[in-house]
Amino acid sequence: MTQHIVSGGPQVVDSESFSALTNVSRETLDRLLSYEALLRKWQKSINLVSNGSLPELWRRHMLDSAQLVCLVPESARRWIDLGSGGGFPGLVIAILLRERPGFQMHLVESDQRKCVFMREVARVTGAPATVHTVRIEAFAQGAEAGDVVSARALAPLDRLFGWAAPLFGPETIGLFLKGQGLQDELTLARESWIFDAEFSPSQSDPEGSVLKVRGLHGPDGQPHRR
């Protein structure tokens, strides 16, 4: 699949403008539309996303997730998404990378109802995703490192790194969607963590950023467990 994420994300208002911006195939768009339909149905009984974000679902959630795809190498096969909630960004990425040989998304979420929802989306869309109903700390114990580790609006960086570090290997890329206050979070995180970081403006949120992290470890050279 050819994936092009370009500036102008705030112009995305529906599935067609999303498709025009990202250049996804018709088949991929149909799978994302199935995801949208299931989310709107389940949202009536489970708080998967904030109700206020539903009118802008394609920008606030679909595009916000999709922008991560172009930030990782095509060799990435094992992607771990922490605190997946309603499936953002992990399920969107799994749908977008459905045709990549050997790709598998691991969705880590402790809320059982949200996990049931994500499994249903994966079943309907054929997304290569495994849902783990477990706390992040428990999943990280003994788990294989990911090629990519991601999270969206999960926790401040100093705490988030405590969960993510055990899942980092020498080549792991961390992708974290952050809002305002990123610089303050980075300053605090550097008091406890060693890492290389770069960030770029979010394509979906004028006030947001995508943080890309490599080489995450504690000051003793080993991943922390908190």
From Swiss-Prot:
Q: Name one GO cellular component term.
A: cytosol
Q: Which UniProt keywords apply?
A: Cytoplasm, Methyltransferase, rRNA processing, S-adenosyl-L-methionine, Transferase
- Residues binding S-adenosyl-L-methionine, per UniProt: G83, F88, I136, E137, R152
Q: Which Pfam families match?
A: GidB
Molecular-function annotations in GO: rRNA (guanine-N7-)-methyltransferase activity
**Record's superkingdom?**
Bacteria
InterPro entries per record: rRNA_ssu_MeTfrase_G, SAM-dependent_MTases_sf
Q: Where in the cell is it found?
A: Cytoplasm
EC no. given is: 2.1.1.170
Q: Where is this region: Disordered?
A: 199-226
**UniProt catalytic activity:** guanosine(527) in 16S rRNA + S-adenosyl-L-methionine = N(7)-methylguanosine(527) in 16S rRNA + S-adenosyl-L-homocysteine
What does the record give as the function of this protein? Specifically methylates the N7 position of guanine in position 527 of 16S rRNA.
What protein family is recorded?
Answer: Belongs to the methyltransferase superfamily. RNA methyltransferase RsmG family.
Q: What is this protein called?
A: Ribosomal RNA small subunit methyltransferase G
Which organism does this sequence originate in?
Parvibaculum lavamentivorans (strain DS-1 / DSM 13023 / NCIMB 13966)
Which taxonomic lineage is given here? Bacteria, Pseudomonadati, Pseudomonadota, Alphaproteobacteria, Hyphomicrobiales
What gene is behind this protein? Answer: rsmG
